[in-house]
Amino acid sequence: MTKVALYKQDGTQAGEVELADSIFAIEPNEAVVTDAVLMQRASLRQGTHSVKNRSTVSGGGRKPWRQKGTGNARQGSIRAPQWRGGAISMGPIPRPYAYKINRKAYRLALKSVLSDKVSAKNFVIIDELNFEKPSTKAIADSLNKLEATKKTLLVVDDANENAKLSARNLPNVQVTTASGVNVYDLVKAQKVVIVQSAVKQVEEVLG
């Protein structure tokens, strides 16, 4: 079992937490992580790009001049692709870019990134984040004491609404729940700060 330090909300160490080696101590598979990141980035694309082709561009129903006798090249419409203001041939049309990879591969990618964060000591476990009311200042103080001052992914349990509301105004902090942990967010974050109860939820899902 891999052991990681457990911290309190005030930044003091409260003990250690044992993590499952099958999730947090595997050999990272960079190829699978890359596939997972590309898949997530592709799903973020809107795919709303569109141009007008011969059937949608307006005008051009009349032949600009007769077929023969003018000395000009034959033309059938002023909206043909070679004309200025004409239609676009083989241009982009709206389409979804999203695709899926195998669930087994995605789970391996999650384990790979989590293992990399743990081995690099960029995985911080906190016993709890309790606030009587949402407070950006309070959660910023807690993260500063944990030395999570740069790009940080804060993972809380699903029921911790005050922590989610407190952290959403911090520019370098992205907050998510244990059920919403994904490869792209983990890769982007320099440090992961996770509540102990959320660790158990992650282990239940990936175990």
UniProtKB/Swiss-Prot annotation:
Q: Its GO CC terms? A: ribonucleoprotein complex; ribosome
Q: What subunit structure does UniProt give? A: Part of the 50S ribosomal subunit.
Query: What are the recorded Gene Ontology BP terms?
Result: translation
Region (Disordered) spans which residues? Answer: 45-77
Tell me yes or no: is Transmembrane helix among this UniProt entry's keywords.
Answer: no
Q: What family does this belong to? A: Belongs to the universal ribosomal protein uL4 family.
One family from Pfam that matches here is Ribosomal_L4
Q: Where is the composition biased (Polar residues)?
A: 45-57
Species for this entry: Oenococcus oeni (strain ATCC BAA-331 / PSU-1)
SUPFAM superfamilies per the UniProt record, alphabetical: Ribosomal protein L4
Q: Which NCBIfam families match?
A: rplD_bact
Q: What is the protein named?
A: Large ribosomal subunit protein uL4
Q: Name one GO molecular function term.
A: rRNA binding
| Keywords for the protein's UniProt record, in alphabetical order | Ribonucleoprotein, Ribosomal protein, RNA-binding, rRNA-binding
Organism's domain of life? Bacteria
Outline what the protein does.
One of the primary rRNA binding proteins, this protein initially binds near the 5'-end of the 23S rRNA. It is important during the early stages of 50S assembly. It makes multiple contacts with different domains of the 23S rRNA in the assembled 50S subunit and ribosome.
